Regions:
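Short glycine/serine- and small hydrophobic-enriched flexible loop segments
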Residues: 10, 75-76, 135-136
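A generic, residue-level signal for flexible/boundary positions that often mark functional hotspots
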Residues: 16, 26, 49, 56, ...
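Short, surface-exposed connector motifs at secondary-structure boundaries
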Residues: 82-87
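Stable alpha-helical structural segments in soluble proteins, enriched in small hydrophobic residues
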Residues: 73-81
Length: 167
């Protein structure tokens, strides 16, 4: 599964990107990674035979860490900007797994119905999940809405961004 998303940024007098926090912990690489590719295992026909191009994960470990990391980071970003979850109009999480999406919403205590979800239509489109979900839900987004974006991925790496919708 792969995906691509593009977000067009334009100059504005309004503040759109309020904050972003990106974190990583390399000890998670054994639990979620793609061994092949990059400088260690450059693309080759042998890479295809060895199947090192596929994502490998320990689902239980990833599940637990994704929920905790995404939730903690969302709350951290909100706190350092003097917001609470009640101020958030929309949570836009990485669309990897519906159970993780629901658990993050529960963990940060966001009001039901304020989480944008589209995984049932496309599955996990990797790096495109958040832009695709925002695009699909553009009609719900109103000027001035506060959006909390959050994701978790290989390595482990995770983060959250706080945006003010300016369109």
């Amino acid at each position: 599964v792969a995906g691509a998303g593009v977000v067009l940024l334009e100059p504005t007098n309004e503040e759109g990107i309020l904050d972003a926090l990106l974190l990583s912990n390399g000890t998670g690489k054994e639990f979620l990674n793609i061994e092949g590719g990059g400088s260690l295992y450059p693309a080759s026909s042998q890479l295809l035979v060895d199947e090192k191009r596929y994502i490998k994960q320990d689902g239980k470990v990833v599940f637990k860490n994704a929920i905790q990391s995404m939730s903690d980071t969302c709350l951290n970003v909100l706190k350092r900007n003097d917001f609470t979850v009640e101020n958030v109009n929309w949570l836009v999480p990485h669309q990897a797994n519906k159970r993780i999406i629901d658990a993050v919403g529960n963990e940060i205590n966001i009001e039901e119905g304020k989480t944008l979800v589209n995984i049932e239509h496309y599955g996990n489109t990797i790096a495109a999940t958040i832009p695709l979900c925002m695009w699909e839900n553009t009609s719900k987004l109103k000027k001035g809405d506060l959006l909390m974006l959050t994701a978790f991925g290989a390595g482990f790496s995770w983060g959250a961004s706080l945006l003010r919708w300016t369109i």
